[in-house]
């Protein structure tokens, strides 16, 4: 696993249940504002055969419009919607949610600030 992917996974683990963050938000918080696609690639790699990384709540990352992104995996959007709903996030049948209501940006920023001292 690359160091960059490890940073992405560590940050995604900071997103609390019932909250979400955008791909771009994750990228900004790790210091690579233009790497939102890389965040997507890293999260997609979690499902790759032989991947040993566990306990990364990939479903808590959505696009910048508050929508679950389509995936190469047939049922991934439905799985993500169901996992978010199980955490209390209101996700519409159109796979949209309110970033205003569920964003973890400030929470993650505070966790990082405390961690870095």
Language model feature labels by segment:
Residues 1-117:
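Nucleic acid-binding interface residues in structured DNA/RNA-binding domains
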